Amino acid sequence: MFFTAILKSFKQAFIFKYKMTIFKSGHLVEALSSCPFSGHYDGFTKIYKGKKISTIKTPFIGSVILEYGNK
């Protein structure tokens, strides 16, 4: 399961709540520390290796990358 919504259109609290649900339920969430986009702001979106991704920062588990689309 991947995000299909555009994160920039959501309220920050909703992004955090929804992302935590996906993280805890075992869906794909890759640690930002392993990615060259480390340090970007919430809602940063870019095409990377043919996939659309966004970075999100949270106070509890740090920064993560959310992938869009099918794999």
Curated annotation (Swiss-Prot):
The protein's name: Uncharacterized protein 272L
Ranked from the top, the taxonomy reads: Viruses, Varidnaviria, Bamfordvirae, Nucleocytoviricota, Megaviricetes
